[in-house]
Amino acid sequence: MRKFLATATLSLMVPAYAAAEPLSVCVFDVIGANGDVFNVMKDYALEVKSLGVDLELKPYTDEGVAVGDFNAGQCDAVAATDLRTRPFNKFTGTISAVGALPSYDNLETLLATLAQPKAASFMKQEGYEVLGIFPVGAGYLFVNDRSINTAGALAGKRMATLEYQKDAIHMVDYVKATVVPSDITNFAGKFNNGSVDTAYAPAFAYEALELYKGIEPNGGVVDYPLAQLTVQLIARDDKLDDEKAQKAREAAWGMHGQVMSLIDSQESAIPDEKWIRIPDSDIVGYQEMFRENRLEMRDGVNGAPSVYDARMLKLMANIRCASNPGAAECTAANRE
């Protein structure tokens, strides 16, 4: 009898073991295995282990190599910024559209919506699936001169711009600044050594990438979120069944509070006197400028690249108007 029970128990364990087959993940973190993104992914791996998903994390400090290895089949999934994962899912890749989510409350509402089962169909595109979305903080403009505090003041300034970020290049051209082609591994060095006048990054870069050096002695950080940046976990859509994929997204959403606490500590680490405050009257104008640019980059008109998903832009517009119904955009004829 004991032998029968033991055999039966082992037979029941086999499917569970098979379901926990490892899923290798190329993880981009500019700091490497000791960085905040990699640590968040380690916590996420613990969360999904109970689902029978055993993540094997491989750290990469070069995002292009991480995505390249994923494309080459060296990893089953990749965790990278949405600027790089946009080709795998244009819908979620549009979260970082310029000026589309002016507050963290707006971002929270969006991510809560995307974690629901009814959004599952939007998480798949052409053989790939989004398994998790993790905020890395709002993107701010770091400047070497505090007088660079308006869109007009950017004219002629040298801006470190990611070569593959077509929307940023369009915006830099729009404000008549000068694009200095860069990537995530070298933009900080260019800003810190004075090769460029401005750089665009989340608050973590102030200390982690030593951008505090680049703003000395007369610069600062413009206190306006140009975009909400995220790291997205993308896998081939045959790696997890629909139920596990949905639970994986819910696990990522369940970590939102933890991740936002980390972002809050990173923003708090920037001394108050280093922030450059923008008058509310100016912000209204900037929001309309960004909206016009989003429409151009949705439709691919006026020389703009077509990089934004209309469905995501509409969803984010609905979220903005729910939180600020009096905004002019909410009754505009060309509302997103």
Task: Name each model-derived stretch.
Residues 58-97, 142-144, 199, 203-215:
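Pocket-flanking alpha-helical
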Residues 21-86, 320:
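General N-terminal leader/first-domain-start detector
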Residues 178, 182-214, 222-229:
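Glycine- and acidic-residue-rich phosphate-binding/metal-coordinating active-site segment common to enzymes
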Residues 16-20:
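Boundary at the C-terminal end of the N-terminal hydrophobic targeting segment
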Residues 81-175, 211, 225-335:
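Contiguous mixed-secondary-structure segments that line small-molecule binding/active-site clefts
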Residues 1-4:
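Positively charged n-region of N-terminal signal peptides that target proteins for export
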Residues 21-51, 129-193:
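Bilobed "Venus flytrap"/periplasmic-binding protein-like clamshell domains
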Residues 7-15:
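Bacterial N-terminal signal peptides
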